């Protein structure tokens, strides 16, 4: 049963009438451009064919009812007439409440809504299940009440909800690619201007995501430390963000910086340049160059930004040994575990899957999870 059929059926059972709309918003994987988003830099993600789906209908009162199919059909209910505060027990509900509250704060006028939510974006894998939920909820209200919002505004609203209501710091990339993704394309995003450019993906190339299933523990504290180190670097150069520093300026004075901060800054500056070049390489179908850039990105995350772990490095090495210069592979996401992403000619996918199955668990004691994805369309009706 598809997520659409599942949510429509649950909706009719729970609320006693049929849903009028079904909306989807996808998860994402970032092909290159890691930790550049909060430095006002460039990222190159694509939306994937794992999504959050919401069957919904408008109400003629001010009540919001939300059922979470993936959390034992838990039901949250709140009123648009009262101040929206955090739910005491249901963490999932706070993503919904946060999006609704921040749409209100943006002076959007809308009435009540019934929703049933289900998704298949793997949670805790760094594939943006939370952003896909935020964008899906924003798109529901925009569609049901014809709100004057474009995809970028729905994305910004989701980011605001996550930062201010849920209380989790995040950049804008995850929401933006979920809202604006384009089938068979990646999206080069300028995280300062929020300008986007669709970049066509080479034909016959699979987007493979492999979850190391190494439990991320340091991710919150270390993420904040990296952010602070980048801000320290920007202050040293008297610039609003590292986006504004050139590699030449950095090289001239790198010795004056704290050695750790210097390594962090070097990663951001080189990663930004790699990301812009990667968009051109992809567009030209130059998988060899794309593979080189992904390898450089991984080495920079490992050695300069220091956010990889041995399990992730092992996975990357196993895949690289199979694909050689026919594709690319690197860690993706915040770091300290999570996933790797690989661009692999479709005919090599079985060999990669076999090599990983034979070697990864033997070397690490952990079983991986293997996803073959297609670059997919952003949020909308389904």
Curated annotation (Swiss-Prot):
Keyword check for NAD: no
Any GO CC annotation of this UniProt entry: cytosol
EC number: 2.7.1.6
Annotated Mg(2+) binding sites: 130, 162
Active site: 174
Main location: cytoplasm
Record carries keyword Metal-binding: yes
Enzyme class per UniProt: transferase
Family classification: Belongs to the GHMP kinase family. GalK subfamily.
Name under which the protein is recorded: Galactokinase
């Amino acid at each position: 049963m598809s997520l659409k059929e599942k949510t429509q059926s649950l909706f009719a059972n729970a609320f006693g009438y049929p849903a009028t709309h079904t909306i989807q918003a996808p998860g994402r994987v970032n092909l290159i451009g890691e930790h550049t988003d909060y430095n006002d830099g460039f990222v190159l993600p694509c939306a994937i064919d794992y999504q959050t789906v919401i069957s919904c209908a408008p109400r003629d009162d001010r009540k919001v009812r939300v059922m979470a199919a993936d959390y034992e059909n838990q039901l949250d209910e709140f009123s648009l007439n009262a101040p929206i505060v955090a739910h005491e027990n249901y963490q999932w509900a706070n993503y919904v409440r946060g999006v609704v509250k921040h749409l209100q704060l943006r002076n959007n006028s809308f009435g009540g809504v019934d929703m049933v939510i289900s998704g298949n974006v793997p949670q805790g894998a760094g594939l943006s299940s939370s952003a896909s939920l935020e964008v899906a909820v924003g798109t529901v209200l925009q569609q049901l009440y014809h709100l004057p919002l474009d995809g970028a505004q729905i994305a910004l609203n989701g980011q605001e909800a996550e930062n201010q209501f849920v209380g989790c710091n995040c950049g804008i990339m995850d929401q933006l690619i979920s809202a604006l993704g384009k089938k068979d394309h990646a999206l080069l995003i300028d995280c300062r201007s929020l300008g986007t450019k669709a970049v066509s993906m080479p034909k016959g190339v699979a987007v493979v995501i492999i979850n190391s299933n190494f439990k991320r523990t340091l991710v919150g504290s270390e993420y904040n430390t990296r952010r602070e180190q980048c801000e320290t670097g920007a202050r040293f150069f008297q610039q609003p963000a590292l986006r504004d520093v050139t590699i030449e300026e950095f090289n001239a004075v790198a010795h004056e910086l704290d050695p750790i901060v210097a390594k962090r800054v070097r990663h951001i500056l080189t990663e930004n340049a790699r990301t812009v070049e990667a968009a051109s390489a992809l567009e030209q179908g130059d998988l060899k160059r794309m593979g080189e850039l992904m390898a450089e990105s991984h080495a920079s995350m490992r050695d300069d930004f220091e956010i990889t772990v041995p399990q992730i490095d092992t996975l990357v090495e196993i895949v690289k040994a199979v694909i050689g210069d026919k594709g690319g592979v690197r860690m993706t996401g915040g770091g300290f575990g999570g996933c790797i992403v690989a661009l692999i000619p479709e005919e090599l996918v079985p060999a990669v899957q076999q090599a990983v199955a034979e070697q990864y668990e033997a070397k690490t004691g952990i079983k991986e999870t293997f996803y073959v994805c297609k670059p997919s369309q952003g949020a909308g009706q389904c």
